[in-house]
Design a protein with these regions (language model features):
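A generic structural motif
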Residues: 76-77
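Short strand-turn-strand beta-turns centered on an Asx-Gly dipeptide
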Residues: 10, 64-67
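Eukaryote-biased recognition of intrinsically disordered, low-complexity regulatory segments
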Residues: 2-22
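Short, contiguous acidic and Ser/Thr-rich linear segments
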Residues: 19-31
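Short, structured protein-protein interaction patches enriched in aromatics and acidic/basic residues
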Residues: 53-60
């Protein structure tokens, strides 16, 4: 059974834009992306929207629907009342390219800043082994489809553009946490990097990133909070503290 519903779709580019009202047919079983495609086909032939798999596994169609970051391909029209106006806008934290398409290159830049996995120097192909519990501990994080909705909803980025230079965001702090807990990774400075370079201290664990994750990854509880705890343990470790005092005293004597 079909029905006519009201949509408000953001149209424009980085210089100017606004919401456009449109009435469109909605059929049983459809998702928001289906309706956007119908609007493209019948009323707005030049409407720009990014999408790919239409199965909730590529993260391409992330946008804000009624003010909340969602995947358009996974948001069912049956969740809206017939009289409700569905407002569709681009992800607010990133610059608009056109219409519903945003420039998410900020995330690619942050990904490149994260040092990659560093295996033991003397290891040969096929020699590395891990306990199953270590494999399972970080398996959750690898479910990420890079929709960047966690990045978009994080208020440190969303409300403070100036923080982007010094804050990696929940998606890439999660990556730092994953590598830091990897038993075979040889880098020992990941906690320092997370705190001093990638802005872990900016996160105040509101869990908004966890709430919007379409893969239901517990970003805050299983990645960010444990990483914060390890950073604190390292900074206030009594042996490390005593060692730093001794070294500082020796430096003073030498000078």
């Amino acid at each position: 059974m079909s029905r006519i519903m009201n949509f408000r779709i953001w149209r424009g580019d980085k210089s100017d834009g606004g919401l456009r009202d449109v009435q469109v047919e909605v059929n049983e079983g459809e998702v928001v992306l289906d309706v956007i495609h119908r609007v493209q086909a019948t009323q707005m032939g030049d409407l720009a929207v990014r999408w790919n798999c239409k199965a909730g596994k590529c993260g391409s169609c992330s946008m804000e629907i009624n003010g909340k970051p969602r995947l358009a391909c996974m948001t069912r029209m049956s969740t809206f009342e017939d009289s409700e106006t569905v407002t569709v806008t681009p992800l607010r934290a990133f610059p608009v390219i056109r219409d519903l398409v945003t420039d998410v290159s900020f995330n690619y830049e942050k990904a490149r800043e994260i040092p990659s996995f560093t295996p033991p120097a003397d290891s040969k192909p096929g020699e590395l082994r891990m306990q199953q519990e270590d494999v399972e501990r970080s398996q959750e994080f690898r479910k990420c489809i890079e929709c960047y909705m966690c990045q978009n909803v994080c208020h440190v980025i969303r409300d403070h553009e100036e923080n982007k230079k010094s804050f990696a965001g929940p998606r890439y702090l999660m990556r730092m946490a994953e590598l830091d807990m990897h038993p075979l990774d040889q880098r020992r400075d990941r906690k320092d990097l997370a705190q001093e370079v990638h802005g872990l201290g900016f996160c105040n664990i509101t869990k908004c990133c966890t709430e919007v994750c379409p893969e239901h990854i517990k970003i805050t509880d299983n990645a960010l909070i444990p990483l914060k705890e390890r950073v604190v343990d390292m900074k206030y470790d009594p042996i490390r503290w005593l060692g730093s005092k001794i070294l500082k005293r020796e430096d003073i004597k030498q000078n």
